[in-house]
Amino acid sequence: MSYFPILFFFFLKRCPSYTEPQNLTGVSEFLLLGLSEDPELQPVLAGLFLSMYLVTVLGNLLIILAVSSDSHLHTPMYFFLSNLSLADIGFTSTTVPKMIVDMQTHSRVISYEGCLTQMSFFVLFACMDDMLLSVMAYDRFVAICHPLHYRIIMNPRLCGFLILLSFFISLLDSQLHNLIMLQLTCFKDVDISNFFCDPSQLLHLRCSDTFINEMVIYFMGAIFGCLPISGILFSYYKIVSPILRVPTSDGKYKAFSTCGSHLAVVCLFYGTGLVGYLSSAVLPSPRKSMVASVMYTVVTPMLNPFIYSLRNKDIQSALCRLHGRIIKSHHLHPFCYMG
């Protein structure tokens, strides 16, 4: 997700001075597309998405707390997982709170500055998720294919470097998006066909030919769908053979369980992301394409803790030990006994 914006500069040009009257210059605000126009349905949707948002934040916070407080989880896999949880909190917090407030106030307005800010954080955290999922696939590859050298290869210095590298690439991607959008000086309309400031939707509003916009969207889908997934699938292609050679069924189950959870998250993240971007160019109804956007920005971060961690025995044991320490600190009996 970090390299394609550079190519945008070959496509994006300032709007010509002979623009037609319907083209708008100096736009100060945009109008977001709501999930429903029924005023009676707004409180129901607001309550639903508030519940999903709270589940997402609390679930990911539990993972971060469990990993940081338990020495048994101070391993590269859980270190990357806790950073993925942090990125998921930021990712969903970029769009969902604004959407809930809009539902409650029956407002669809977002300022130009607010739109660019939301877009920047959206790209930042989406790219962080993208990078971290790839890093986690590499971590599983090293753990299974090179178990004897795992601690040497995945040392704390390399783990920290991979996190910092992911962050700075994501930050660069975010700022390049900002620079690209600042090149747009006029728009055909102020209605964004999504519930947040999606970069692809903003490109649709610019004055130049929409054919280039559609090509850019397909290019984005190809780059950020095919290439990262290909890298992850290649890692798992290398992983399958060593797993099949594991002598014990328990060892095979543990390896497949870890890899299966990660692959489920990967498929959910990249699949809904690709569908969301491509459907915006294919489907005639904006509300139909918004279903994929909701899955991508709301449902996926909510399901990640359940898919990857909260069903993990190590995480459950860590949470149990943490609960026991909290109760002991209040001079009560521990919640559970861990032998």
From Swiss-Prot:
GO terms for molecular function: G protein-coupled receptor activity; olfactory receptor activity. Disulfide bonds join C115-C207. Coiled coil: none annotated. Glycans are attached at N23. Odorant receptor. Belongs to the G-protein coupled receptor 1 family. This is Olfactory receptor 7E24. It comes from Homo sapiens.
